[in-house]
Curated annotation (Swiss-Prot):
Gene: tolB
Assembly and interaction partners: The Tol-Pal system is composed of five core proteins: the inner membrane proteins TolA, TolQ and TolR, the periplasmic protein TolB and the outer membrane protein Pal. They form a network linking the inner and outer membranes and the peptidoglycan layer.
Protein name: Tol-Pal system protein TolB
Entries under NCBIfam families matching the protein: propeller_TolB (TIGR02800)
Alphabetic keyword roster: Cell cycle, Cell division, Periplasm, Signal
Segment forming the signal sequence: 1-26
Secreted as UniProt keyword: no
Length: 444
């Protein structure tokens, strides 16, 4: 029986048409946010409506400017100056900028742009301006793509601005795979779905005929691992994002497989296998089918996650009597415990920057999302609620998304995000209950 409903491919071709401008954007200048763990005063910026260069592009020009502004202000590092406060109007992309008018409303950064549309093709041009230096940063850039991909182009513009001002990579042009949930708590229907990082453009990847859990993107974002109960027992499946073609992995009679995650090579998968009441961590070569056992313990070992260089794996285990976090070599070997605080630790995931491990912690009746150094030091709890669990990293390693669920029969799961300092906690706007988020890498 085919469990999966076919959808159109998600891919979108985008072109960077002025690559010569990229080095200019990389230059150092006075317009800068230094990201630290202390209190940051958001940088005031303005994004006036982009100029419509062709008839019929007016609404699109406004919509793109709004998405760009929402991306930046949503980080907590930027504060948008509303259009009602603007003194100047930008009526032409190449017209001189009245910098004094923007200084008068305390804007430090300004993004101007234009949009043209011809048939299904859309082109957006933009410039980032340092208002107090009275100059644009670089010669201007443009992206082109299909009209249906206009939000991606807006996210890419925001990524460029974020990167230039903070000196770090952005994360707006990315997707999140998650589990959509409907129905009462004791009989929920669960489907795989994907969305833009901000909750827009939801697409469903499976039907609700079986329970699905723990989806994970490949390092290139073109495949998704997940666990399904379509056979009555948990099994790992691999889906091609473009075609939705799906196949099972690591099948073996009398076993259950779950908690899969890709290695950075995109070929190897680490997962948990339960057999005869014992759960250990294995790896599987998805091309050859070769399987290797990494742990051999009477305890429960699960939730493996690779370091960015692929040399180590962090996982959870109750080998010490309680649920704790351990790190071992990627090829197996003696693990070392890294969690040392009171409470139970689970769902570890290594930051793409390599410096932190995020986790779920249960302590004194509360659940927390936290981070620690890879040696277990500097543990910080970022959230606290009735149930917070399952963190996933944004591509730049600065933001986490996770599941939060309220108490009682009416409590519904929802997706939230928080930055690694514990600030800027916010709910992802979705029309359905959702759980198990997993962030993609930046889209190509």
């Amino acid at each position: 029986m085919n469990l999966f409903r076919s959808l159109a491919p998600m891919g979108l071709a985008l072109a960077l048409l002025l690559p010569a401008a990229a080095p200019a954007l990389a230059q150092q200048g006075p317009l800068r946010i230094q990201i630290t763990e202390g209190v940051i005063e958001p940088l005031p910026f303005a994004v006036p409506n982009f100029v419509a260069e062709t008839s019929g592009a007016s609404q699109l020009a406004q919509d793109m400017a709004r998405v760009i502004a929402a991306d930046l202000s949503g980080t907590g590092l930027f504060r948008e100056i509303p259009a009602s406060a603007h003194i100047s109007r930008v009526t032409s992309f190449d017209a001189p900028i009245a910098y004094n008018d923007w200084k008068a409303i305390n804007a430090q950064a300004l993004i101007t742009g234009s949009v043209s549309a011809s048939g299904d093709r859309v082109v957006v041009k933009f410039r980032l301006h340092d208002v107090f230096s009275d100059q644009p940063l670089g010669e201007g850039l443009q992206f082109a793509g299909s009209a249906s991909g206009w939000r991606r182009m807006a996210h890419k513009v925001a990524d460029v601005a974020y990167s230039r001002i903070t000196g770090e990579g952005g994360y707006f042009d990315s997707r999140v795979v998650f589990v959509s949930e409907t129905g009462p708590k004791n009989a929920r229907a669960k489907r795989l779905a994907v969305m833009d990082y901000d909750g827009a453009n939801v697409q469903y990847l499976t039907d609700s005929s079986s329970i699905v859990l723990a989806p994970r993107f490949s390092p290139t974002g073109d495949r998704i691992l997940f666990t399904s109960y379509s056979t009555g027992f948990p099994r790992i499946y691999l889906m091609d994002v473009g075609s939705l073609a799906t196949r099972s992995l690591a099948e073996q009679p009398g076993t259950m497989t779950f908690a899969p995650r890709f290695a950075p090579d995109g070929r190897t998968v680490a997962f948990s296998l339960e057999q005869g009441g014992n759960t250990d961590i294995y790896t599987l070569d998805t091309a050859s089918g070769t399987r290797r056992q990494l742990t051999n313990s009477p305890s429960i070992e699960t939730a493996p996650s690779y370091s960015p260089d692929g040399s180590q794996i962090v996982f959870e285990s109750d080998r010490s009597g309680g649920q704790q976090l351990y790190i071992m070599p990627a090829g197996g070997g003696e693990p070392r415990r890294i969690s040392n605080g009171a409470g139970r630790y689970g769902t570890p995931v290594w930051s793409p920057r390599g410096d932190l491990i995020a986790f779920t912690k249960q302590h004194q009746g509360r659940f927390h999302i936290g981070v620690m150094r890879t040696d277990g030091s500097e543990e910080r709890l970022l959230t606290a609620s009735f149930l917070d669990e399952g963190p996933t990293w944004a591509p730049n390693g600065r933001v986490l998304m996770f599941t939060r669920e309220g108490a009682g029969a009416g409590g519904q799961p929802a997706l939230y995000s928080v930055d690694i300092s514990g600030r800027n906690l916010k709910k992802v706007p979705l029309s359905v209950p959702a759980s198990d988020p997993a962030w993609s890498p930046l889209l190509p």
